[in-house]
Amino acid sequence: SDTITAWVPLDGSTLDGGAMGYIAGSHRFGVRKFVDIFSGEPEDLLAAPEVRGAEPIFVEVPRGGVAFHHGLTFHVAKPNRTPRTRRVHTMIFFRDGCTRASGGFHPSVDRAGIEAEQAIASSVTPIAWPRASGDLPEPPPPPVERLWGWPPPRRDGVR
């Protein structure tokens, strides 16, 4: 519950292009259900009794902008009805000492091998603040699997 997410649509987001919508105040409902958006069947969280009847507020974010939301905020994206790919980067910030609630799939903590009830603390989830001046964490290791074509070749042909 002590997390904040930065949602960064790299090309901006529009209502036709997959804008994110939020249920106002839903982070206070006490619902702690993680939905795996990467696999499995989609689940309609908007049908939950706590949210029934609430309408998401969709936010268009301009290129270069960031939308922040509490980790327990119910959120949903509109479908992308444009010919462009919706490119988004997400960063999740955890409070120092935060523990993993369950063992369900979550890329932010799975990469570091953090089990349920363990503190979320690793080179992949460094403490951002406070840190002593000059005390920088070691960079995280690269992902095991690389996406096709990434990283792009450098101009000198070296990867």
Predicted regions and their residues:
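Acidic, His- and aromatic-enriched active-site or binding-groove loops in soluble protein domains
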Residues: S1-I4
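Short, hydrophobic/aromatic alpha-helical segments in well-folded domains
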Residues: A6-P9, V76
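Short, structured patches in soluble enzyme cores that scaffold and shape functional sites
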Residues: V8-G12, A24, F93
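Noncatalytic linker/hinge segments flanking ATPase motor cores
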Residues: D11-L15, A19, V31, D44-E55, ...
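Double-stranded beta-helix
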Residues: S13-V76, C98
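Non-heme Fe(II)/2-oxoglutarate
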Residues: V35, V66, L72-R159
